[in-house]
């Protein structure tokens, strides 16, 4: 396609309506029609990236292959489209301002007074068009975080207004709003949507398509009313009702011809149907599963979004193993030797979750010991893997005071130590070992059986590592180091071959699992959990 087309996705009425899912679904449908698509997220907060944000506030921090700490929506983009995103796919207000201020300090603006318009808006526009200009995508979908009406969003909306004016038919705005249901009146109310669109119109943007989020179906009359009062075409009002799974959304959008409407409005031919065969096959597998696999997630964060990618990876793996997933959250802060049997005895497998800091760490040791001694399939990820190693040192190697330098700087047996290159680091943000690194697998391991190859590449986010001083002792006692980074000799994977499935990875495999290509380790873990 000669020119890149830009689709902007904004949200109104309330946050957390699922702009990321709608953006991903649009991308999925366009990709299924043969177009080359990418998605980017603009977050209006002033942090440079979400790397230092509290998971309680913001959910998980996603990591791209090039080592950028990003918004969890990038996980949705990758899972829905099977693409790899980079630092350029997630921009924050903090990065926009930093870039402009750096240019001002260099003298790039030749003494001009730096203002929101044009300097900040020009920088936003440059970033919007960056991926399209560099990689010649057919479509760049840009999700704007936050809600229309927020002060923080105004520079982004002004940038969209300008881009729509500059690009003409090559730019389109999809506005997602919420239609509440009043139980007392037994009625859906469209007034908040009308006000949200008026707010958007007041900054000079007329949405081309409206997606209405609701718990209930909207009838044709209601959709016609919204079209009339919001000044959009009738066929450009689409409903997005709650679904049993987010992976149903692209199908529902296609049934309402959202993809056709977009192509028509952007002056592109509408030929044939999108190829959604593999997607529909996945959904068919998901809905036809009758048996259930119960997995415990042992971690300290109670917000489910803090483990979003792990949950999605487990769900995908369960589907491909013809099982439904039932997840039980176990708060590691309250897990003790006294109650661990009650919490974990009836689950089929356990994931010891990643995290940072002292809180809840002892509960993870308790879980690792219980699953090791009861031969229960166990998957430790990042800090979870480190907990497995520490527990093994304490209870098998006999180092009762073994620990990580992160938890106890004075531990005499630092089986987990700070990485050499991290010792001089003072800043917290963006300074960890981040992004994709090589790993070579032992061909005699369960991990190799899962991957079916010796060389893999996985994404990391950590400062601490397995201490190779203790490696020989671990191996002799039965915990094998089966995945090694060829450059640094860093231990990436540990496993106990004598147990059914007891594997810990320093990397985050959940970032590489997609709907149509589930991660081999999650597939293998679920397979072990369901085998009696």
Predicted regions and their residues:
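Flexible phosphate-sensing "switch/lid" loops adjacent to ATP/NTP-binding sites
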Residues: 1-325, 333-349, 356-357, 363-370, ...
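A generic structural signal for well-ordered coil/turn residues at beta-strand boundaries
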Residues: 3, 206, 233, 291, ...
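Cysteine-nucleophile active-site neighborhood
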Residues: 17-20, 24-28, 32, 343-438, ...
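Active-site proximal loops enriched in glycine and acidic residues that flank catalytic Cys/His/Asp
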Residues: 11, 41, 214, 241, ...
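Short beta-alpha connecting loops at secondary-structure transitions
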Residues: 57-65, 243-247, 352, 373-379, ...
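C-terminal and late-domain segments of enzyme folds
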Residues: 434, 438, 442-532
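Glycine-rich, charge-decorated loop segments at or immediately adjacent to ligand/cofactor-binding or catalytic sites
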Residues: 182-189, 386-395, 496
């Amino acid at each position: 396609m000669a020119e890149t087309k830009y689709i902007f996705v904004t949200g109104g009425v309330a946050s957390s309506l699922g702009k990321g899912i709608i953006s991903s679904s649009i991308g999925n449908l366009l990709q299924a029609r043969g177009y080359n698509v990418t998605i980017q997220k603009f977050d209006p907060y002033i942090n440079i990236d979400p790397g230092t944000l509290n998971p309680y506030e913001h959910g998980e921090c996603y990591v791209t292959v090039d080592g950028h700490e990003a918004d969890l929506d990038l996980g949705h983009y990758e899972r829905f489209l099977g693409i790899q995103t980079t630092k350029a796919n997630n921009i924050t207000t903090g990065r926009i301002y930093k870039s402009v201020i750096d240019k001002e300090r260099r003298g790039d603006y030749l003494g001009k007074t730096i203002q929101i318009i044009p300097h900040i808006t020009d920088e936003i526009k440059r970033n919007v068009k960056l991926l399209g200009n560099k990689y010649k995508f057919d479509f760049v979908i840009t999700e704007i975080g936050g809600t229309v009406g927020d002060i923080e969003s105004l520079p982004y909306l002004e940038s969209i207004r300008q881009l729509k004016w500059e690009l003409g038919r090559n730019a389109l705005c999809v506005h997602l709003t919420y239609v509440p249901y009043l139980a007392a009146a037994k009625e859906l109310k469209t007034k908040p949507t009308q006000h949200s669109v008026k707010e958007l119109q007041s900054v000079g943007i007329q949405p081309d398509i409206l997606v209405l989020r609701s718990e209930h179906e909207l009838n044709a009359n209601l959709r016609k009313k919204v079209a009339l009062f919001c000044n959009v075409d009738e066929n450009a009002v689409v409903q997005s009702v709650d679904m049993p799974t987010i992976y149903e959304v692209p199908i529902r959008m296609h049934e309402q011809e959202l993809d056709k409407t977009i192509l028509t409005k952007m002056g592109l031919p509408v030929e044939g149907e999108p190829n959604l065969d593999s997607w529909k096959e996945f959904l068919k597998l998901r809905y036809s599963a009758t048996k259930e696999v119960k997995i415990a997630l042992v971690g300290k964060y109670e917000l489910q979004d803090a483990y979003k990618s792990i949950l999605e990876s487990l769900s995908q793996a369960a589907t491909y193993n013809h099982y439904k997933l039932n997840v039980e959250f176990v708060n590691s802060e309250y897990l003790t030797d006294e109650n661990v049997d009650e919490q974990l005895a009836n689950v089929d497998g356990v994931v010891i979750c990643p995290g940072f800091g002292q809180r809840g760490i002892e509960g993870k040791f308790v879980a690792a010991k219980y699953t090791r001694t009861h031969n229960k399939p166990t998957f430790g990820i990042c800090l979870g893997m480190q907990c497995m190693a520490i527990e093994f040192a304490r209870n098998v190697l006999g180092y009762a005071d073994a620990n990580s330098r992160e938890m106890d700087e004075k531990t005499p047996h630092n089986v987990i130590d700070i990485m050499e290159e991290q010792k001089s680091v003072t800043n917290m943000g963006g300074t960890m070992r981040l992004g994709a690194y090589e790993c070579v697998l032992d061909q005699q391991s369960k991990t190799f059986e899962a991957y079916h190859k010796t060389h893999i590449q996985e994404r990391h986010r950590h400062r601490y590592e397995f201490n190779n001083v203790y490696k020989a002792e671990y191996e002799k006692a039965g915990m094998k180091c089966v995945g090694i980074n060829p450059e640094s000799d860093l231990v990436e994977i540990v496993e106990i071959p004598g147990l059914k499935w007891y594997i810990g990875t320093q990397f985050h495999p959940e970032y590489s699992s997609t709907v149509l290509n589930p991660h081999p380790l999650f597939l293998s873990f679920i397979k072990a959990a369901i085998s009696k």
